[in-house]
Amino acid sequence: MDSIKLEFNTPKLKKLRTIYIVEDNAMERNMLIDFLGNYPELKIKEFSTGDDCIKDIIVSKISPDLVLLDYFLDSNNPLSKDGLEVLTKLKEVSPNSEFIMFTSVDNERIVELARKKGAMAFIVKGAAGYELLDSIIRNNFSREAF
C-alpha cells in the first residue's frame, strides 16, 4: 500500500471522554498513553489483551467512547485473538463505542476487513499515524462533555 494511513469515516464522537487502549506491547502502549496525555480530560484505560478489555466492559457495564486497537495482540500469548477477532467481539459487547485500528500492519486485506467489521479508521503507526490520530481526537473532542 502506498499510503501511510487509511481513514474510513470519522463521524463526530459525541462527548469523547473515555479511550481504551488494547495493545500487547508495553512500550507501544506507554507511547500511546503519553501521547493521549495531551488530553488530560480524557480517561484512559489500558489492556494488554483483547480478552481483558472485553471482560472489563462486560463486568463494569461501562463502554468506552473510543477503543484504539492493535492488530497483532499475541506477543505475550501466541493463542491470543488478533485485533479483528477482538473488534468483532467488542462490537457485540459495546455497540455504541467507536473503534480505530492503530497498528504496524499495512495490509490491504486487513484494512478492508477492519472496515467491514466496523472500524471507523485504520491507522498505521508512525509519526504520520500519530498526527492523524491527534487530528481525529482534536476534531471530535468535545470539551463541553465535561
What are these regions (language model features)?
Residues 67, 99, 122-123:
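Two-component signal transduction core modules
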Residues 46-66, 70, 74-75:
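Acidic, metal-coordinating helix/loop segments flanking the phosphotransfer/catalytic sites
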Residues 1-20, 25-31, 130-146:
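Non-catalytic signal-transmission and effector/linker regions of two-component phosphorelay proteins
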Residues 78-96:
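Short amphipathic alpha-helix used as the core "switch/output" element in two-component signaling
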Residues 85, 105-123, 131:
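Alpha4 helix (beta4-alpha4-beta5 surface) of REC/receiver domains from two-component response regulators
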Residues 26-51:
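Two-component/phosphorelay signaling modules centered on CheY-like receiver
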